[in-house]
Amino acid sequence: MTAKTLIVLIGPTGVGKTELSLRIAEYFKTSIISSDSRQLYAELKIGTAAPTPEQLKRVPHYFVGTLQLTDYYSAAQYETEVMSVLEQLFQQHHVVLLTGGSMMYVDAICKGIDDIPTVDAETRELLLHKYDTEGLDNLCAELKLLDPEYYKIVDLKNPKRVIHALEICYMTGKTYTSFRTQQKKERPFHILKIGLTRDRAELYDRINRRVDQMMNEGLLEEARSVYAHRELNSLNTVGYKEIFKYLDGEWDLDFAIEKIKQNSRIYSRKQMTWFKRDEEIRWFHPEQEKEILSYLQASIK
């Protein structure tokens, strides 16, 4: 009997995961689970490079466009819901594919969410006050002192992530990293991790061209349609936050587009830093489809 296997296809933004994920899913006649924390939102299609209606017809997808912008959602909820969906899918398929670039969501399924302490209201209020009065840069500098390892990989432009890490440091006297690296949970399926990578110059060129394509497809109009919700964490996202600066009158449009490209490149580097720590990932160029399928066939028990 073939063991249940979860293929995890990961890689930085713009590397070429989408088309290859479709081809792998079609080869194994299975479904795709998205691990992109922004593709969850129905209003965010162009800026998240969400699967198109045609792609959704080719392969059944889960966790794409299922939330509204105002819905609260966490990696812990994602873990619970994906594990439930996987239990159902493995009754129909011996292989399921999970793909995306949201590092915490991938880890939530492969390793499980760590038992991070609940933050008390006093600590949260203290740090929110510091954020309001001192700004994000000062909090980032403090995080660098208290937890230099997490500082290297966290999105320093995301106040929610920075503040949460500091909350744990304040409350426990330990690093946030120490709670994130505990023993991983056992899963009732085999996990095979495929990483996609490209030469940096090649990847950066693809990212730049993809941003231009998003603008041609209507990213400005999409960002304008959600502008009223711009304070939500779900919109503290590359591609939207830069256009909000344009809509606020702070930047001109050409500058905003260049900042989207720059911030996308920075994000891709952070993704690779995170993924490269994982020795279970087998790395390929996206055009090595034949080699990837051969490796998967040989590895599925």
Swiss-Prot record:
Ranges where the record places region Interaction with substrate tRNA: 36-39
What keywords does the record list, in alphabetical order?
ATP-binding, Magnesium, Nucleotide-binding, Transferase, tRNA processing
Top-level EC class, please?
A: transferase
Q: Which GO terms describe its biological process?
A: tRNA modification
Q: What InterPro entries does the annotation carry?
A: Dimethylallyltransferase (IPR039657), IPT (IPR018022), P-loop_NTPase (IPR027417)
E.C. code: 2.5.1.75
Provide the catalytic activity annotation.
adenosine(37) in tRNA + dimethylallyl diphosphate = N(6)-dimethylallyladenosine(37) in tRNA + diphosphate
The record lists substrate as bound by 13-18
Spell out the residues of the site Interaction with substrate tRNA: 102, 124
What domain of life does the native source organism fall in? Bacteria
**Binding site residues for ATP:** 11-18
What NCBIfam families does UniProt report for this protein, alphabetically?
miaA
HAMAP family given in the database record: IPP_trans (MF_00185)
**What functional role does this protein have?**
Catalyzes the transfer of a dimethylallyl group onto the adenine at position 37 in tRNAs that read codons beginning with uridine, leading to the formation of N6-(dimethylallyl)adenosine (i(6)A).
Q: How does it assemble?
A: Monomer.
The name this protein goes by in its record: tRNA dimethylallyltransferase 1
**From what organism does this protein derive?**
Bacteroides fragilis (strain YCH46)
